[in-house]
Curated annotation (Swiss-Prot):
Residues annotated as glycosylated: 362
Protein name listed in UniProt: Protein PBN1
Membrane topology (UniProt): Single-pass type III membrane protein
Signal peptide: none
Primary residence: endoplasmic reticulum
Length: 413
């Protein structure tokens, strides 16, 4: 049986009072823009390996959502029985793609479920999905200004489904504690579509992910961009929040890019680290890298481009990359691991302790141009090469045969 929980998070009490209406059959939300709707669907499953699938277009962190890596990421606990596309990391195997690849999701999705990956709203929303003994699909959608959404019992899909809806605003959100105030309703399971009970609700918990936009942290690509791109992370105006805190940058590098662990040793590096292989010889999707950053200064991360297989037309391939700059703080609190809306698990969170709070500073998208040979130039390159070889042979022959003639002329004189 499916259970569905819908949560709407307003930015303030004022927006909550003005934007939420409730009657016997629906909760209607009138958005000002920026409201987050989390829909959690849960089913029992036959079992299998524990897998986490995430999909995001950028920044997702809020009081009810963690920070998900941009693009598609698939994490398999233990890392056994995965294809060569995966990277073996600490306690997990990882697959990543900047684009949505539904085949990578279908490979782990239970076939018996009524809802299949094609039915999800990939183009509009972010997803945090857990597969295994149960299937849990957390959908995060941001509402646009002027958008109106009606939340009803129909979200359950069937009359037997358990449906719960909550509408909240943050009463306290200071980075250490979150207190959400609002109301929540349950729905009758008799096909009437009417609410069962509604009650005021106060939720208090400690978040594992916090958005920290101030002080500003800049992420830039040093110009001009060469075969060895350099990323600058400006932490000049930033200091550590405490003795148990440290700043890091997390990178998911596609096959076109890599780091030299000998030139600039990272804290963690999983995946393709061969310094000589061209892109088309790399088997896995790329690598995951974490570097320690020093607050109070501009930090540089040195990348390198792999030689790419030539193709028609393009002289450069633009590779998107989104570095995640965050401060990781050990708290000593067991309450950090999970809260009513998300729990820490696989992903970059697995590289830190269970009591770590992630304070996210910036995640600017960078577009890195990687040189790629133009196969349309092959005929002209071959023509010039042949001419150069012929000219070289003629010139060398001329020099070899000219010297004896000149010497004999001097001798006869």
């Amino acid at each position: 049986m499916q259970s569905v929980r819908q949560t709407v998070l307003f930015e303030s009490e004022e927006a909550w009072r003005a934007g939420a209406e409730q009657n016997a059959t629906a909760i209607t939300v009138h958005a000002r823009g920026g409201e987050v709707v989390q829909t959690r669907r849960t089913w029992a499953a036959a079992g299998g390996p524990r897998v986490r699938v995430t999909w995001s277009g950028g920044r997702t962190v809020s009081e009810v959502s963690p920070q998900l890596a941009a693009g598609l990421s698939v994490y398999v606990e233990g890392g056994a029985h995965v294809s060569r596309d995966f990277v073996q990391a600490r306690g997990q195997a990882v697959f990543h793609s900047a684009q949505l690849e539904l085949d990578a999701v279908r490979a782990w999705w239970p076939r018996e479920l009524a809802v299949q990956p094609e039915a999800l709203r990939w183009a509009e929303c972010a997803y945090d999905i857990e597969l295994g003994r149960q299937v849990r699909v957390d959908e995060y959608c941001a509402l646009r200004a002027g958008e109106t959404v009606a939340l009803t019992a129909a979200a359950g899909g069937t009359d037997e489904a358990k449906v719960e809806t909550g509408v909240f605003y943050p009463e306290i959100s200071d980075g250490a504690d979150v207190s959400l105030s609002g109301f929540r309703c349950t729905w009758l399971r008799d096909g009437s579509g009417r609410t069962d009970t509604c009650q005021k609700t106060l939720l208090m918990y400690k978040p594992a992910h916090v958005h920290m936009p101030e002080p500003a942290v800049g992420i830039e690509l040093v110009q001009p961009v060469t075969l060895h791109p350099v990323i600058e992370v400006d932490l000049s105006s930033v200091s550590a929040s405490g003795p148990a805190c440290a700043h890091h940058v997390f990178l998911q590098l596609p096959a076109q890019l890599f780091v030299d662990k000998f030139q600039q040793p990272p804290e963690l590096l999983f995946g393709e680290d061969d310094l000589e292989l061209p892109e088309y010889k790399v088997e896995a999707w790329g690598s995951e890298v974490i570097y320690a950053l020093e607050p109070g200064r501009v930090n540089r991360v040195q990348l390198h481009s792999r030689y790419a297989r030539p193709g028609p037309g393009r002289r450069y391939e633009v590779v998107p990359l989104r570095p995640y700059v965050f401060e990781a703080c050990d708290t000593g609190s067991a309450d950090i691991a999970e809260n009513p809306f998300y729990s820490k698990g696989m992903g970059f969170e697995a590289y830190f302790t269970a009591d770590t709070v992630f304070k996210h500073r910036n995640s600017t998208r960078l577009n890195i141009p990687v040189p790629r040979g133009n196969s349309n130039d092959f005929p002209s390159i071959q023509y010039v090469t042949v001419l150069s070889i012929l000219f070289s042979v003629l010139y060398i022959s001329y020099c070899l045969f000219r010297r004896p003639v000149a010497a004999s002329a001097r001798a006869s004189g």
